[in-house]
Amino acid sequence: MATKRTFQPSVLKRKRTHGFRARMATKNGRKVINARRAKGRARLSK
């Protein structure tokens, strides 16, 4: 029995969990965005 691949890509799932709107929805998510802004990241979220 082969083990299944853990990465099953879905754009919708990715956006809902790691997207910009999802980050902004929570206090800790906003902390993530601000930390990435302070670091000078080109991409703040997926």
UniProtKB/Swiss-Prot annotation:
One of its GO terms (cellular component) is ribonucleoprotein complex. One of its GO terms (biological process) is translation. Pfam families: Ribosomal_L34. GO terms for molecular function: structural constituent of ribosome. The keyword Transmembrane helix does not apply. Keywords: Ribonucleoprotein, Ribosomal protein. Belongs to the bacterial ribosomal protein bL34 family. This is Large ribosomal subunit protein bL34. It comes from Vibrio vulnificus (strain YJ016).
